[in-house]
Structure formats: structure tokens, C-alpha cells
Amino acid sequence: MKLTQEDHNWLEAYRQTLDQQFPGMVEHILLFGSKARGTATKESDLDLLVVIRRGDWRLKDAMTRPGYLLATASDVVPSIIVLTVEEWELLQKQQTPFWLTVQQDAVVLQ
């Protein structure tokens, strides 16, 4: 894992915000991609998968918004994907390339 102090600060602020605004909704937060693999460059974004217990597209959108707002005050460039547990399990069952990539790279943050 190759995270800057600013990445750590952003992640902690985002996790706290999710806990406060959406209590009990987050099942897992997974870091994946180049930052998780330790191959990040200055131009790399921070790939994050948030798995929630349930919800629709409105809730998913509402859960990504704070992350992007927090990023405006930093140099962190997040790429946030929110899926329900059911959607994540379906990707697992289908062994999709996205699921395989996340499984290979993932660092569990929550």
C-alpha cells in the first residue's frame, strides 16, 4: 500500500463522515488499484469501493458526494464506487473482471 499522509487524512475524514451521515450502512470499505498495490504515481487516483448493506442509486450518490467534497480541500483524487452487498455478491458469483481485480488488490479499510 502506497498512501500519502494526505490520502490517510482524506480516508479517515471520509470514513468518519460516512459513519456520521449513514450510521450502520457501510459493510466494507476497500482500497484497490495502484495505491493498494503500491505502484501509485503522483497522477494516480485513490480507488475506493464502499459496500453498503442496502440502497438505491440515490443513496449511493449521496454517499459518494461527501468524499468528493472533502477532496476539494486536498490533492487527493478519489474514484469512489458504491455497491450493495447483493450487487457485490453477484459480481463475485459472475467472477467479473472488476471483482477479480478488487479481490487481487484490495486492502480492507473497514
Model-derived features: where do they sit?
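Conserved H-loop
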Residues: S34
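Catalytic core of pol beta-like nucleotidyltransferases
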Residues: M1-H28, R37-K42, I52-Q110
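Short beta-strand->loop micro-motif that forms the acidic, two-metal-ion catalytic signature
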Residues: D47-V50
